[in-house]
Each structure stands twice: as structure tokens, then as C-alpha cells.
Amino acid sequence: MGISKKSQVSRELDTDGKKFIFAKTSIRASLKPVKTKLIKPERESEDGICITPTARGAKTPECPAAPRKRPPVLKCQNNIRIEYFVPPSDFELVFIQRR
């Protein structure tokens, strides 16, 4: 009914240089129309409707705020000299010279 008696053959080259042959046959068949009926959606009762719960017990607890960043550590300034020991002017007199 839908098959033609004549078949077509085509010869082609592959990317690798190999030859291959396709046998082309056409199938012609008439399709019958599909009949469908439109189904009206049924009205759902109030029990079947999905509603987001709004009660206090249904709400998820809120997360606490994120911790704050710590302030940056003050770095020592190299320009300031700290003198731990100030030698007295007569400090050299403490030492005895030996020859």
C-alpha cells in the first residue's frame, strides 16, 4: 500500500575515505486523523487546593545575623623608636681600663 516498488541507492564517501552505500526506500502511508475530546477540568474542593501555611508554627525560624568582621589589628609603626635603656653620661666611668 505505502511502499514504492522502486528503491534508490546512493553512494557516498566517509570522512576517512571509506565508501558506503545507502539504500533509500520511501514509505508512504496515509495516517488516519486522531480524534480527541477536550476534557473540562473538574473543580477541586477546598480540601484539594494547595495553600501555603501562614500560621506561626508553620514558619521556619529565622537565622541569627552573620557575625561581624573583627577590626584590623594595628600594625607597629617603624618610624617610632622605643628606647628601653638610656645610658647615663658617666657610664664609661664604671669600666676600668686595663693595659
From Swiss-Prot:
Upregulating conditions: Up-regulated by DNA damage and oxidative stress. Down-regulated by iron excess treatment.
Region (Disordered): 49-70
Acyltransferase listed as a keyword: no
GO biological process assignments: DNA damage response
The keyword Cell cycle belongs to this UniProt entry's keyword annotation: yes
Keywords, alphabetical: Cell cycle, Protein kinase inhibitor
Top-level taxonomic group: Eukaryota
Tissue: Expressed in root meristems after induction.
GO molecular function list: protein kinase inhibitor activity
Function: Probable cyclin-dependent protein kinase (CDK) inhibitor that functions as a repressor of mitosis in the endoreduplication cell cycle. Acts as a potent cell cycle inhibitor, regulating a hydroxyurea-dependent checkpoint in leaves.
Name of the protein in question: Cyclin-dependent protein kinase inhibitor SMR7
Organism in which the protein naturally occurs: Arabidopsis thaliana
